[in-house]
């Protein structure tokens, strides 16, 4: 390609941990594909920073979930976007890659595209599930979409948006056969009774809303299944500090609280109770039975319900096109209901085997060498815009 010997500048913006994972994967591919002296900068997290990315702002500044919750953060978010836009206009990159975070990135991408800067968006918003009107924003903002799921490019191309299915880096990273025994050894949980991983979210607001309910459900599960053990991974030291009082308030629970190591915790588990999000896909790739749940403030929930198209919210169910694991959302997410559903997932061996087959098929479909495919797509966009 024309730029083989020319250093490039690629700006990227990720707004939450799942985007940081995707960004790190893409950066790995770009380092292998583009000239060694190329520069990568913008907004990202620790995974991206670990692969020679210059984070001008930490992604935590953008990690706000929900309509109502975002209102108080709007001034700072707009200030950051304005400063970043001025930087990118002053020194235009060869390409801009927005990684998820559509509410932040689409407006920025539209402005950059209008200035002649190639725009790529990594992660197609779930227009097939809710807020389908966003396709109009995509058409205005995005030159090329990198899609995690195989059915997405056709939807975008019908609207006139170029798109490439690149798979999911988690499917490349996670082995087809999880090492449950090795994970238990790593966590200090060899032998003993069954293990349930409990993941109440990766944001303070999520844990504050659903954490107490999850811990009450754990108390009920231990009463109904003596010998059961729990492992709760906290995404950050701050979230571990937030979870510790919940552990202290339930002294009879057999619970291991870890910092990070969510994948190890899920690998060690016989079943998982998990807040809806990308982590549910990770649980599926680990072939684990699970119960998916969430709670959001009432107004946010009403808006989401009115704008939704599908009867399910969890990625395993969306990818399967049907309910393969239970979902207990909002007022249905009671401690008693969560305990019953999770113990059913734990005890039903026939269901466990059926889920393993379903999740293996998903795994194989998403295992596409995402880093290489995504980097090739970005390189193609850059090359197509270079003067000949």
Swiss-Prot record:
Pfam families for the chain: LpxB (PF02684)
Top-level class of the enzyme under EC nomenclature: transferase
Keywords of the record: Glycosyltransferase, Lipid A biosynthesis, Lipid biosynthesis, Lipid metabolism, Transferase
SUPFAM superfamilies: UDP-Glycosyltransferase/glycogen phosphorylase (SSF53756)
Any one Gene Ontology BP term: lipid A biosynthetic process
Keyword presence, Chloroplast: no
InterPro entries for the chain: Glyco_trans_19
Pathway(s) where this gene product acts: Bacterial outer membrane biogenesis; LPS lipid A biosynthesis
Entry similarity comment: Belongs to the LpxB family.
Protein name listed in UniProt: Lipid-A-disaccharide synthase
Species for this entry: Burkholderia mallei (strain NCTC 10229)
């Amino acid at each position: 390609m024309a730029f083989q010997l020319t250093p490039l500048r690629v700006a990227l913006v990720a707004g939450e941990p799942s985007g940081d994972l995707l960004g790190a994967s893409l950066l790995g591919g770009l380092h292998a594909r583009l000239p060694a002296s190329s520069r990568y900068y913008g907004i990202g997290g620790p995974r991206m920073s670990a692969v020679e990315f210059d984070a001008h702002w930490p992604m935590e500044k953008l990690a706000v979930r929900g309509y109502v919750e975002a209102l108080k953060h709007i001034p700072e978010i707009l200030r950051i976007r304005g400063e970043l836009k001025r930087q990118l206009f002053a020194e235009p990159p060869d390409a801009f890659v927005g990684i998820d975070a559509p509410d932040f990135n689409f407006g920025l991408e539209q402005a950059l595209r209008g200035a002649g800067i190639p725009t790529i968006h990594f992660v197609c918003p779930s227009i097939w599930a809710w807020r389908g009107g966003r396709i109009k924003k995509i058409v205005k903002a995005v030159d090329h979409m990198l899609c995690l799921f195989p059915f997405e490019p056709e939807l975008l191309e019908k609207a006139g948006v170029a798109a490439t299915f690149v798979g999911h880096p988690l499917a490349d990273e996670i082995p087809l056969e999880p090492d449950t025994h090795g994970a238990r050894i790593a966590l200090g949980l060899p032998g003993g009774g069954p293990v349930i991983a409990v993941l109440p979210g990766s944001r303070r607001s999520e844990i504050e809303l659903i954490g107490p309910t999850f811990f009450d459900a754990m108390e009920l599960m231990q009463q109904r299944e003596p010998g059961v053990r729990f492992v709760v991974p906290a995404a950050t030291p701050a979230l571990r500090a937030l979870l510790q009082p919940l552990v202290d308030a339930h002294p009879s629970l057999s619970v291991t609280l870890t910092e990070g190591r969510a994948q190890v915790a899920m690998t060690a588990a016989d079943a998982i109770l998990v807040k809806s999000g990308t982590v549910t896909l990770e649980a599926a790739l680990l072939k684990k039975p699970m119960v998916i749940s969430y709670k959001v403030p009432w107004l946010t929930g009403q808006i989401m319900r009115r704008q939704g198209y599908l009867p399910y919210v969890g990625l395993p169910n969306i990818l399967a096109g049907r309910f393969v694991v239970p979902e207990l959302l909002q007022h249905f997410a009671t401690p008693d209901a969560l305990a019953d559903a999770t113990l059913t997932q734990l005890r039903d061996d026939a269901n466990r085997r059926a889920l393993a087959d379903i999740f293996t098929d998903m795994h194989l479909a998403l295992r596409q060498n995402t880093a290489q495919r995504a980097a090739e797509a970005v390189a193609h966009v850059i090359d197509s815009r270079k003067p000949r």
